[in-house]
Amino acid sequence: MIRVGIVGFGTIGKRIADAVAAQDDMKISGVLKVTPDYEAKIAVERGFKVYTLPDGLDKFKKAGIEPAGTIEDLIEASDIIVDASPEDVGRENKEKYYIKFNKPVIFQGGEDADVAEVSFNALANFEEAAGRRYVRVVSCNTTGITRVLSSLMLNGIKIKKARIFIARRGADPKEHKKGPINDVVPNPVTVPSHHGPDAQTVLKNIDIVTMAVAVPVTIMHMHMAYLELDGSYTKEAVIEAFAKTPRIFLADVGAGFQSLAQIIEYARDLGRPRGDFPEVAVFRDSVTVNGNELYLMYGVHQESIVVPENIDAVRAVLGLAPKWRSIEKTDKSLKLITEGKRYG
């Protein structure tokens, strides 16, 4: 059984830890926390060994948490590391620790692409991560983009160019110091936003431009996409592609899905941990084909969309399973929607 160490136990790290714990071919060797807060105590209650930085050992002991060791001890106890640190900290960890230990590491999309050898999305380029030392799972928005575009391309729908407009959530639900509160902020004001070039690190030949604004919500991002297709395709063919592809959910207005809030409420009603929705929620009614032009809207749950990607990245790097077997295994273990999906 593969031993996975999680560096960072915040919004993404704690979700990845729970996902690893749900697998039958990997287990948590431990998690790294810098602060002995409630999340650290929850990690202990979950049965995870908690590690910290060398200068934090006494701080944890005073808080009543006996650390299992330092970050170097965690790396030594692991076959692979998933670094879910805040933005840019992953690169610092690489230079300070990971290079020395020469073990594979999965980074997150908050890091620049050059931190890793490969930027990763399971549907798009699973095989490229095989045997790599450093792999980066792209950000939530980029994961949403690459997943939607890959869904079409895997089903024979060719894309000439993509123009995607993103309404980014202003903050995660627990982030009390971020915003905006009463504003719409170009994020960035320049074109393109970083999401398009980031998507090109995975889908290297795609012609894509993105624009983004930050809006005063916390639940999800909304993408509005215009795609120019290379050929003539029907609306039915596009919808069938989404219906068959794993990690895509078709939300119907007639079934009560009129907003992103209702997507999250659906996740809660399903009993999903933390109300997570790792699937991309494509609004079926928005899918419109006009000649070779395709229009659609879809929601991206920023807290959870990358979680299954990280599990697949571990398998891809270590060669634990081929692409479709890994994706199916991950989806079933995390209780994602698998009915009607085609794995292969």
From Swiss-Prot:
* Alphabetized UniProt keyword annotations: Cytoplasm, Glycolysis, NAD, NADP, Oxidoreductase
Protein name listed in UniProt: Glyceraldehyde-3-phosphate dehydrogenase
What metabolic or biological pathway is this protein involved in? Carbohydrate degradation; glycolysis; pyruvate from D-glyceraldehyde 3-phosphate: step 1/5
Q: List, alphabetically, the SMART domains matched.
A: Gp_dh_N
- Residues binding NAD(+), per UniProt: T11, I12, G110, R169, Q302
Supply the EC number(s): 1.2.1.59
Location (main, coarse): cytoplasm
Please name the InterPro entries in this protein's record. DapB_N, GlycerAld/Erythrose_P_DH, GlycerAld_3-P_DH_AS, GlycerAld_3-P_DH_cat, GlycerAld_3-P_DH_NAD(P)-bd, Glyceraldehyde-3-P_DH_2_arc, NAD(P)-bd_dom_sf, Rhodanese-like_dom
**Can you say where in the cell this protein is located?**
Cytoplasm
